[in-house]
């Protein structure tokens, strides 16, 4: 994305536009390093610290200062701080906008409010966007080499039509995904599932298919998971949904829901489901988010584990990566 923005015309803002856009375009993901602090730290800080309305502006200023100060050593070609800062804002803003468009979401209001913003339009790494950007950058470069071979004059500094076209196509693609997402949600809400009426529905992108969505819907007693085809030749079948039964009310479930970490996890999870099991000296309640398949090998697939004693008093609580629990259970 940074290279496309540079070649689409932002290189005219500064001679260092490309490196500035590249650095600012990836720097926000430094908060993903919280992964190495464990699942609990990852839940708290990823897509938050440097993706928020507080962290992102500070990050833009820090990066702009770094480039500006480095350029001051070259007295013959200094950089204007205002232009560098503008490029940093564009780079970080484009990055955060794409993250908001994913199903993972962003904690824009961190640290003031633990609320996730997500449009559920794109997978974390969308192969179709990557393909469009690559085509928009590589094909003009190939044509340029051919034109040089036949003696055409090289035009320097002009915006690349290929890069502009690629950015326009990406914008149209996201708009089309928004339309498809709305259709998927309406399709989910228009059906009954094994006799149950949906209360809330969500549609999440399938990275392998343009037309298939992971549908998840909440009914009074169950959470249903079903594939939703949109725009293709397949027909939606509500009866093919996989049913997950919610646990009934019990002292153990009620006590687990009141645990501080469980409440924080529920703010993160879109479709939380609790599983209750007896232990030697009490109870264990596991919360997972059905937005993700159970075997989804992504660090965003988190679970909360609440341990209670026989008197339903909180004994331990923690966040885990679902992939680690799956490995231990094998």
For every predicted segment, state its role:
Residues 1-183, 189-195, 205:
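N-terminal membrane-targeting hydrophobic helices
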Residues 197-200, 207-330:
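Extracytosolic and intramembrane catalytic regions of membrane-associated proteins
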């Amino acid at each position: 994305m940074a290279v496309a923005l540079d070649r689409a015309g932002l290189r005219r803002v500064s001679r260092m536009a490309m490196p500035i856009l590249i650095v600012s375009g990836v720097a926000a993901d430094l908060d993903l390093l919280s992964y190495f602090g464990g699942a609990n730290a990852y839940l708290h800080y990823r897509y938050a610290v440097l993706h928020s309305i507080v962290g992102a502006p500070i990050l833009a200023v820090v990066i702009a200062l770094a480039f500006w100060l480095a350029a001051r050593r070259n007295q013959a070609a200094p950089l204007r701080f205002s232009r560098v800062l503008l490029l940093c804002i564009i780079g970080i803003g484009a990055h955060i906008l794409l993250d908001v468009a994913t199903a993972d979401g962003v904690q824009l209001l961190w640290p003031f409010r633990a609320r996730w913003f997500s449009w559920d339009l794109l997978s974390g790494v969308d192969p179709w966007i990557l393909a469009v950007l690559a085509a928009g950058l590589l094909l003009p470069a190939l044509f340029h080499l051919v034109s040089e071979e036949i003696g055409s004059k090289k035009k320097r500094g002009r915006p690349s039509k290929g890069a502009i076209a690629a950015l326009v196509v990406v914008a149209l693609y996201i708009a089309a995904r928004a339309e498809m997402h709305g259709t998927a949600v309406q399709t989910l809400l228009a059906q009954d599932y094994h006799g149950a009426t949906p209360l809330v529905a969500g549609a999440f992108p399938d990275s392998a298919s343009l037309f298939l969505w992971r549908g998840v819907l909440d009914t009074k007693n169950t959470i249903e998971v079903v594939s939703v085809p949109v725009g293709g030749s397949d027909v939606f079948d509500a009866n093919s949904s996989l049913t997950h039964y919610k646990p009934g009310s019990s002292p153990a479930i009620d006590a687990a829901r009141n645990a501080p970490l469980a409440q924080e996890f529920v703010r993160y999870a879109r479709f939380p489901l609790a599983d209750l099991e007896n232990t030697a000296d009490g109870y264990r309640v596991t919360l997972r988010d059905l937005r993700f398949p159970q075997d989804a090998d992504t660090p965003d697939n988190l679970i909360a584990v609440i341990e209670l004693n026989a008197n339903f008093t909180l004994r331990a609580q923690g966040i885990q990566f679902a992939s680690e629990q799956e490995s231990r259970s094998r």
